[in-house]
Amino acid sequence: NKPSLSIVNPLDVLRQRLLLEIARRQMKENTRQVELNRAILKNV
């Protein structure tokens, strides 16, 4: 039997938030990189 969801390990929550934040930053970085590459290709 799993404990109810109301009992959440604070550390788990923190880790989840951290992972989400990292993933979001990487996505932002990737889109920026793609845009840079596109601009470079356009100028060639």
From Swiss-Prot:
Family: Belongs to the sauvagine/corticotropin-releasing factor/urotensin I family.
Assigned keywords, A-Z: Amidation, Hormone, Secreted
Modified residues (Valine amide): 44
Domain of life: Eukaryota
Subcellular location: Secreted
An example molecular function term from Gene Ontology annotations: hormone activity
Cited InterPro entries: Corticotropin-releasing_fac_CS (IPR018446), CRF (IPR000187)
Pfam name, any one: CRF
Name this polypeptide is given: Diuretic hormone
Primary location: secreted
Function: Regulation of fluid secretion. Stimulates primary urine secretion by Malpighian tubules and causes a dose-dependent stimulation of cAMP levels in the tubules. May act as clearance peptide in that it may remove metabolic waste from the hemolymph.
Gene Ontology CC: extracellular region
